[in-house]
Amino acid sequence: MIKRMYWVAAAAVACVLSADAAFDARPVSIAYRTRKEGSVDVAGIRFNLPRGHNDSVTGLDVGFIGLCTYMYGVQANVLGSLVKDRAGALQVSLYNDVDGLLTGVQVAGWNNARGGEGLQIGLLNLSDEFYGVQVGLINRANLLRGFQIGVINVIRGARVPFVPVVNVGF
C-alpha cells in the first residue's frame, strides 16, 4: 500500500511538471537577460530587469525594456515597450512600438504602430494605417480614419496632407 502511494505521488509530480512544460507559461517572470524568440510565455507579471523577451505576455509587463511578439494587457517600461506582431494593450514608455496591429492606447514621447485602432498620445505619433485619434506635437499617418490634434498633422493619403491644429481623416 505504501509503495503504491509513492507511485501515485511520483505520478502526480510528473503530471504537474509535464503540464507546466506543456503550457510553457509562467505567472511571474523576472527577465534579467535577453531571451531568444520561442521562449517561455508569461500569463501574469513580467519584470524586465533590464530587458525581457518572450513570445507572448498576457497581463502586466514592467521594467526598463520589454520586447515580445504578442502583448495583451498593460506594458509600462521606462525606456521602451516593443511588440513584434499584435498588441491589445495600454503601452506607457518613452518609446512604444508595435510592428503589427495595435488595439489600445499608446502614451509615450514617441509612439509607432504599423496599423491599429485606438489612441496615440505623445510628442511624436507615427502610424501607417490607423483608426482612432492621434494627440501630439507631431502626428503622421499614411492612412487615418479619425482625428489628429497637434501642431503638425500629416495624413499622407489625404487630399490635403498637412493641416495644423486639427486634422480629420475619413
Please place each PLM-identified region on the residue numbering.
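Bacterial N-terminal signal peptides that target proteins for export
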Residues: M1-V8
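Surface-exposed, glycine- and small/polar-enriched segments that build interaction surfaces at terminal
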Residues: A21-F170
